[in-house]
Structures are given as structure tokens and as C-alpha cells.
């Protein structure tokens, strides 16, 4: 329950992609603003929940982290089924992970049909520019072709564009459609939320790289 006594609106976000692309790191960076250099593959499905503040509104995000290994694929459709947002992550240094985006999008569409689900494609590990195999332009083109609403490149290691990604996603949710607040309202609300433990305030998050588009 929120402090006003009203239940927070909850949005389920499912993270999809091949093993090792950085799905867990993306969640960890957003939740705790940390990065773990020691890779551990997700076993099955992990779940985390976080309260997020934006535009004088507070919502609850349910983040579902799925395993990329083939042996866990049979578990994933049931978690896609009632999701509001599907984030498909690929590694910009691994072309194979990029080529599998089509399959993940197909899985989402098979489970969600024509329902209103927000598709996001994220190219992670943008800090590894010397090892890049997929250009930003190629990623943007793929996102538009597959009907993704959001495309962005991130670096969970460096912290680039992670909060900006979630801000862009939040702005696409029904809760924030046509949401307006004055600078004074935002300043006062931001100050108040700084004292709320466990709440992520993304009001001031901005894109840090020229590698994002609203598709």
C-alpha cells in the first residue's frame, strides 16, 4: 500500500535474451546501482519487485529475469503471458545474440497475440566499443522492423542509460500517459521522495549516449 492508502499499480516486466547478454546485470544496475564482474547464469526464473517514482506518480515494477539457456525455454512462455513489458536484450559484441531477437519477439507475440504489450530491444555492453559487431543503426533498424516501441543501447558495467531506459519504458505505461507536472511540482516531489527508502526516483534520468530512439 502507498502512504495515501491506495494500492500501487503493478506492472510486470519480463527480460528475455540469450545467455550472457546482461539481463540480470541490467536489473541489478537498476535496482541497486551496482555491477558484479563475476558472471553467474540465471537458473530458471528470478523475480524482483521495486517501487519507482516518476512525474509525481509511484508504481510497483515486477521484474522477471529469465534464463537464456535452452533447457529452461519451456518455462518462459507462462511468464510472458501476463507481462505488460517485454525487454529483449542482446550483446552488441555477439552477433548470434542479435540474430535470436526475432525468435524472442515471436515468443512474445505467440503468447500475447495482438494485446497491448510494450516491446523493447536493448543492445547491452556499449562500453565494449572495440568489440562491437552490431552497429547502433543496425539495432535501430531491427527494432523498427520488429515493431518494438523502444530501442536503446546500454552499458550495465558503466551504468550508461539504464535509468534512462526505465524512464522511457515508464513514459510508455498507461499510468504516465498524458501525465504533466510543473517544474515546481517535480522539485517538491523529488525532495519528498529522496527520503523514502526503497523507492527509485528516475525523474531526472536522461539518456547518456546518442544511441536511443523511440521507434
From Swiss-Prot:
Q: List modified residues, type Cysteine methyl ester.
A: 215
Q: Which molecular function term from Gene Ontology is one that the record holds?
A: GTPase activity
Tell me the residue numbers annotated for binding GTP. 17-24, 65-69, 124-127
* Compositional bias of kind Polar residues: 178-196
**Residue positions of covalent lipid attachment, annotated as S-geranylgeranyl cysteine:** 213, 215
Q: Where in the cell is it found?
A: Cell membrane
SUPFAM superfamilies xref list: P-loop containing nucleoside triphosphate hydrolases
Gene3D superfamilies per UniProt? P-loop containing nucleotide triphosphate hydrolases (3.40.50.300)
Region described as Disordered: spans on this chain: 178-215
Q: Does the keyword NADP apply?
A: no
| Topology term for the membrane | Lipid-anchor
- Positions in coiled-coil regions: none
Q: Which GO terms describe its cellular component?
A: cis-Golgi network; cytosol; endomembrane system; Golgi apparatus; phagophore assembly site; plasma membrane
Q: Which GO terms describe its biological process?
A: cellular response to heat; cellular response to nitrogen starvation; cytoplasm to vacuole targeting by the Cvt pathway; Golgi to endosome transport; intra-Golgi vesicle-mediated transport; intracellular protein transport; macroautophagy; protein localization to phagophore assembly site
UniProt keyword terms in alphabetical order: Cell membrane, GTP-binding, Lipoprotein, Membrane, Methylation, Nucleotide-binding, Prenylation, Protein transport, Transport
Q: Where is this motif: Effector region?
A: 39-47
Chief place of localization: membrane
Q: What is its quaternary makeup?
A: Interacts with YIF1, YIP3 and YIP4.
Which family does the record claim for this protein?
Belongs to the small GTPase superfamily. Rab family.
Further remarks about this protein from its record: Present with 7720 molecules/cell in log phase SD medium.
What exactly does this protein do?
A: Protein transport. Might participate in post-Golgi transport.
Q: What is this protein called?
A: GTP-binding protein YPT6
Which species is listed as the source?
Answer: Saccharomyces cerevisiae (strain ATCC 204508 / S288c) (Baker's yeast)
Its lineage opens with: Eukaryota, Fungi, Dikarya, Ascomycota, Saccharomycotina
In the UniProt record, the gene name given for this protein reads YPT6
Amino acid at each position: 500500500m502507498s502512504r495515501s492508502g491506495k494500492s500501487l499499480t503493478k506492472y510486470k516486466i519480463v527480460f528475455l535474451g540469450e545467455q550472457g547478454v546482461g539481463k540480470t546485470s541490467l536489473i541489478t544496475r537498476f535496482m541497486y546501482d551496482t555491477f558484479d564482474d563475476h558472471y553467474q547464469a540465471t537458473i530458471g526464473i528470478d523475480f524482483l519487485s521495486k517501487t519507482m517514482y516518476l512525474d509525481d506518480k509511484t508504481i510497483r515494477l515486477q521484474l522477471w529475469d529469465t534464463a537464456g539457456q535452452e533447457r529452461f525455454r519451456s518455462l518462459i512462455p507462462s511468464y510472458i503471458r501476463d507481462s505488460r513489458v517485454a525487454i529483449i536484450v542482446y550483446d552488441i559484441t555477439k552477433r548470434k545474440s542479435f540474430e535470436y531477437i526475432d525468435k524472442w519477439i515471436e515468443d512474445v507475440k505467440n503468447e500475447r497475440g495482438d494485446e497491448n504489450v510494450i516491446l523493447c530491444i536493448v543492445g547491452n555492453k556499449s562500453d565494449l566499443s572495440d568489440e562491437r559487431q552490431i552497429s547502433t543503426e543496425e539495432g535501430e533498424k531491427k527494432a523498427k522492423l520488429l515493431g518494438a516501441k523502444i530501442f536503446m543501447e546500454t552499458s550495465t558495467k558503466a551504468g550508461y542509460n539504464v535509468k534512462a531506459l526505465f524512464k522511457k519504458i515508464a513514459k510508455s505505461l498507461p499510468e504516465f500517459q498524458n501525465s504533466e507536472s510543473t517544474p515546481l511540482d517535480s522539485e517538491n516531489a523529488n525532495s519528498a521522495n529522496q527520503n523514502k527508502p526503497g523507492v527509485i526516483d528516475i525523474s531526472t534520468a536522461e539518456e547518456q549516449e546518442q544511441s536511443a530512439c523511440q521507434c
